[in-house]
């Protein structure tokens, strides 16, 4: 566990009197020409898909923010909701339901009625990148939206970063020194009033190769829940004896 010093008394709060913070890019955002072109090509092929920057999902007044890498081509880029429609969402939402950060049943579609509890999900890069690999410039271009997302969550206490890229850009969004908060699965870093929790990304590749197991993933959210305390409004739909490692 590390404690990160900053030059600001509270890096999570917007400065008073500053410009209006914009947490979501335009539907036709052109900040990254490569991503815009890839998005347009997807629109031409699949006109019924979302094919736009994917907005954050969940409660802006939540205490937990989960940050992924970017929308998957046939996941969030198709459905318009983070981590919805691909394997990563299967593991993430099952885990959130288990620990009371989501309620309902995840059915891999945005109209499944699933709600987040005290929690919000966003991505380091809001547009789908070719081969799931955003370029450094694209990560930098999207960082102001991440910063605004963080700054417009007044009750935020915990940030869970899924993967090294999400971790690194979050550290930069908070204006912190990366060397003071190296990424490692299960690591916890303090940044003022915030705690940053690191996890390997819950991708199919990571789980298939054993880099991340469901048990390892659940352990991160178990710690978040323990640190925050119980959420009385959380509703778990998991039945006794039901497998959790699907």
Name each model-derived stretch:
Residues 2-7, 12, 234-237:
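Ala/Thr-enriched low-complexity intrinsically disordered regions
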Residues 14-182, 187-229:
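A polyanion-binding, active-site-adjacent surface
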Residues 238-245:
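Short, low-complexity, charge-dense intrinsically disordered segments
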